[in-house]
A protein has these predicted regions:
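Conserved ATP-binding/catalytic segment of the ANL
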Residues: 1-65
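Adenylate-forming
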Residues: 7-12, 29-30, 52-81, 111-131, ...
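Generic structural signal for hydrophobic residues
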Residues: 76, 133, 137-141
Length: 197
């Protein structure tokens, strides 16, 4: 929440053209507490040792696991991107399961190098489905998570690999390359379900 006299009254809606979506956002994103107007940013922050507020995540990207721990999906994704095999990643978790999983768009050059070192041939899709490749990349991703200081429940336990890049054209990301989680989950539903089997 941020509040004070500089917080606006809400999103502008013209009286002659009411917008129900904006009206709903004005109700859900703005509130008055003890006479002070607040805006619900949706950000999750933490104070640093020197008292500065640091934005660390978005509330909508926090997921509660079965045991009650919260996983910050974008934090996990940022750590996974440090793995040389990972081009893009989407972490997934829900309250029905005790661990997170991830869908990874592989980097082609490191993938081919890994395949050659293991004497595995095939096109990119075949490599992404190869059990040895999946295990090697999963292990590398888990090592990146340890190096990124993720705790055990934050580290995805299983991984689904894809060679197809996520672009605005295939509607997996926005024009600003932010993940469209619902679209990715829908496209990889069978792989995510298999990861929880």
């Amino acid at each position: 929440l941020i509040g004070g006299p500089v917080v606006c009254q809400g999103y502008y809606t013209a009286s002659h053209m009411p917008d129900p979506e904006l009206a709903a956002k004005n109700t859900s994103e703005f509130s008055v507490i003890d006479g002070v107007r607040y805006f619900h940013t949706g950000d999750v922050g933490q104070f640093t040792a020197d008292g500065q507020l640091m934005i660390i995540d978005r509330k909508k990207d926090l997921v509660k696991l079965q045991q009650g721990e919260y996983v910050a999906l974008s934090k996990v994704e940022n750590v996974l991107k440090q793995c040389p095999y990972v081009g893009m990643a989407m972490a997934y978790a829900d309250s029905k399961h005790s661990y997170a999983v991830a869908v990874v768009v592989v980097n082609e050059a490191p993938l081919k190098k890994l395949a050659a070192s293991k004497n595995i041939s095939g096109d990119l899709d075949q490599l992404c489905a190869n059990a040895t490749i999946v295990k090697e990349i999963s292990d590398a991703c888990k090592a990146a998570c340890r190096a990124g200081k993720l705790v055990g429940f934050e580290t995805p336990a299983k991984y689904a690999l894809t060679a197809e890049p996520w672009t605005p054209d295939n509607d997996m990301v926005t024009a600003a390359f932010k993940l469209k989680r619902q679209n990715i989950v829908a496209a990889f539903k069978s792989q995510i379900t298999a990861a929880y089997a």
